[in-house]
Amino acid sequence: MGELQSIGNWWMWSGFGVFVLLMLAVDMFMLDRNGAQKVSAKEALIWSFVWFAMAMLFGAVLWGWLDHTAGREIADTKVMEYLTGYLLEKTLAMDNIFVFVMIFSYFAVPLEFQKRILVYGVLGAIILRALMIVLGAWLIAQFHWVLYVFGAFLLVTGIKMFVFAGHEPDLAKNPLLKWVKKHMRITNEYHGDKFWIMDKGVRWFTPMFLVLVLIEFSDVIFAMDSIPAIFAITNDPFIVFTSNIFAILGLRALYFLLADMAERFHLLKFGLAVVLMFVGTKMLIVEWFKIPVAVSLGVVVAVIGISILLSLIATRNKQH
């Protein structure tokens, strides 16, 4: 048993927490100011770039501070871990977005309601990841062998994802959705943006509630993938948390950017599967062979980049 070493102190954690709350407020204000109007691709692209720039700026500031206080070697290592974790989590977030698109399409969710659901989706993702990071860090500190459990889980998940990447899940057969429909009264129509209504003293849940349940359930599933994956890169809770949160903060802007382009990135899931298999293997062989962080970053960049490029080429060839 032991305690995980972290570069984060109380004021860094507090400062980052305040920053996250401010950025969430900015995100909600900027994307909701047009009401029910669709967020344009241009606006979504600008905000996606802003979030990316902020993540890179944080990395630069972190490197400068560590270089001054802890030395160049630690600064290089920690920022490399941060960048690798950020890229990995951003890719998982993109896959999460494609699931959101599928859910919204299945339930024909009106645009103005999508914005509200996405707020809960982002908040749920942040809260779940924070809780799972705390749990994961505690488990690793108490039981080092948990890393091997994480590694095996990621390896199996990656293999399953690769095998079934071309199969679109049938939401009508989703066990959770079937259970909710069986045990709760569900209306056939939307009632504004309400999750339930009262009719003659009886509570009825609306399709909005079903969408919310599936969105939050998808958050749980993706958190179960992402947290073990980031712990394959670093055991530092501060690096794990900051890279995760920066990857999620721009989720709504990224959704409006990619929502109409989900089909163009159909090979991304194969790339993500390969990455998960890589990080799972990395965790399983760490006792015998430690893969440098720079190599991990290179593998993640190469695999994701190639999968996106091949997706675009395949889509272009199909159009011609």
What kind of region is each of these model predictions?
Residues M1-H320:
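Multi-pass alpha-helical transmembrane bundle typical of ion/small-solute transporters
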